[in-house]
Regions:
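Bacterial N-terminal signal peptides
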Residues: 7-16
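Positively charged n-region of N-terminal signal peptides that target proteins for export
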Residues: 1-4
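OB-fold and OB-like single-stranded nucleic-acid-recognition modules
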Residues: 21-180
């Protein structure tokens, strides 16, 4: 009887822990930034004069390269927007990899977000590119990678094919909940 009870609890706890392990942690973009990374920035925000201060800009760039060690290796779900790096125009705009960014329209033509606010997505299989303003969710294991010089500076990476289109209402709801 005791042996059966022990086996029951062992299996029960294994199943519970295994189900938690498979569940993706929904991550907000601010969690990609470690605490105190930008503690030198005044609460009132950055002024135009601060952009002329080379030491301040150097600190700002250095802070953008800091990553949150607590979330590396975790199975996550992250909402954002696709910025394709290369597309095969002969194959209905197929992509093999892209950058996931927190806001629509962030691309090469505007100043990019800091490296700790971009996630390199490497696809297991090519997929069709999404429209620039189409919110998506990406699921996978978050890794830390060194930035690639002279291209983009993402310091996070996910290899996956779990890309899901999200409707605007769902994206707005997630954004509003993340601000609470």
């Amino acid at each position: 009887m005791i042996k059966r009870l022990f086996c029951f609890f062992l299996i029960f706890f294994f199943l519970i822990s295994n189900s938690f392990a498979k569940e993706n942690f929904i991550l907000n973009w601010d969690k990609l930034i470690p605490l105190n990374a930008y503690d030198f920035v005044p609460e009132t925000g950055i002024t135009f004069e601060m952009w002329d201060d080379k030491n301040f800009v150097k600190k700002l760039n250095k802070a953008g390269l800091k990553f949150n060690k607590k979330i590396i290796g975790k199975s996550i779900k992250l909402y954002g927007f696709m910025v394709p790096l290369e597309m095969d125009y002969h194959e209905d705009l197929i992509v093999n990899e892209f950058i996931l960014v927190p806001s629509a329209g962030m691309c090469i033509h505007v100043p990019p977000p800091p490296p700790n606010q971009m996630v390199m997505i490497k696809l297991d299989k090519p997929i069709k590119a999404r429209y620039m303003y189409q919110p998506i969710s990406v699921e996978g294991i978050l890794k830390n990678t060194p930035p690639i010089k002279d291209t983009f500076d993402s310091i996070y990476e996910i290899s996956t094919n779990k890309i899901i289109d999200i409707d605007n209402d769902q994206f707005i709801k997630h954004f509003e909940e993340s601000q609470k």
